[in-house]
Amino acid sequence: GAINTDTPAVPFTITTNGGANFSTGTSPVTLAGQGWVNIREIRLAGSTVPLASTWTSVNTWQVAVPLTFGPNVITLEAVDFTGAVVGTDSITVTNTGGIEPPQPSTLVVSEIYYNPPGNLETTEYVELMNTSAATLDLSNVNFTAGVTFAFPGGTLLGPGSRLLVVKDSAAFTAAFGSGLPVAGVFPNSLSNSGERLELRRADGAILHSFVFSDLPPWPVEADGDGYSLVLANPYSNPDHANPLSWRASLVAGGGSPGASDSQSYAAWKAANGNHADDEDVDGDGFTTREEYFLGGNPLVAEQTLKPTFQIEPGGTFLISVTRRVTAENATVLPEISTGLINWANDPTAIFLSNIRQPGSPAVDRLTFRLTPPPGAPRFFARFAFGP
C-alpha cells in the first residue's frame, strides 16, 4: 500500500542507552530504536538477511543482534519497500561474557582434508571453529573416532576462531606455511573413503558424531583431487551428517586451513557495481542478490543460471541449481507448492549430487529428486537460498 505521507518523518536511529556505546554480558543483545513507516526491514550493514524485528509502536522497533566477545561495532540499515537503504546508525556494544564449555551448536567441525592427492597423505587435517560469541574452553575435548587427539588443558578458542589438528606438523607446514593455529598432531590417518568422525567434550558428552563419505551426494572433488570438505554454513547449527551441509573447498591444494574461503555478499556486491539487492541490471531475470548465490555476473545476462528440471519415467522430477562456491553461509533447499501461494520444504526431496562446474567463478551444481504430492493436480518447485 501507499505510505502515509501525513505521518511526520522519523529519522532512523538507535535509542538504546541513549544511542551511546555500552557493555553487556549476554548475547544476543536487544537494541531499540525509532524509524519512519517507510521501513520494510532492518538488517546488519553488508548482510542480505533481515533481522527479526518487533515494532513496539508506529515508529519504534526492537531487534536482537548476536555478539562476539569484546567490542562489536554494529551498523544497522533501514531498507524501504523498494530495497533502498533509507537510514543507517551505529553503536559499539562490548560483550564481557566469560568462558564457556563447548556445545554442538557452538563448536563445529568446519573443514576436513581427508584424502590429499599422491604423496601428500601426511598433509591431512581437521579444523574446528567456534561459532559462538563466547570463548570456549577446549580442555580435554577429544576426538574418539576417525582421528585420536585430546586438546591440552587450558586450550581456549575465541569467538569466530579456528583450530587445527594435523597428521604431520612438518608436512603440514611445508604445504601450508607457518603461523597457522595448529593445536597438535594425531597419530593415525583419516580414511580415504570416508569414515565416522567423533568429537567429545571432557565430560564424555558427544559434540559431533557423523560419517562423511567420498561418494555422491558428498562432494567427490574432496576424494583425492586436492580439495577439502568445507562446512557450508557453520553458523546455522548444521547437521554434520547431512551431505547437503558440506561443499568442496574453493581451490585444490588442500583448501584453506585456519581461514574462510568465502566472500561476503557486501564485498562481492561492492566489487560488482554495488547495485541494489533487488535490481536486475542485465535483464536476465535475476536480481543482484540472486546473481551472488547462483554464481552470476550482475552485468552479464546468463540464461545458464536458470534451474533445470527433467521428468523421470516414474513420474519423479530431477531439478538442479547452481550455487556460487564462495557464497557466504549459503544454504539451498528445494521448496514445493500446489498453488503458488504456500511454499514449504519438501520432506521427500532426495539430494543426489553436488558437482563442481568448469569455468570461473567457481560454481557447484546441486541436483535433487522430487516426488509430486499424492493426488495433487498441479505441482510447482523452486529453490530457496539464504544463510
Question: What positions do the PLM features span?
Answer:
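Long, low-complexity serine/threonine/glycine- and acidic-rich segments characteristic of extracellular
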Residues: 28, 32-96
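Exposed beta-strand face motif in extracellular beta-rich ectodomains
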Residues: 70-74, 193-195, 377-381
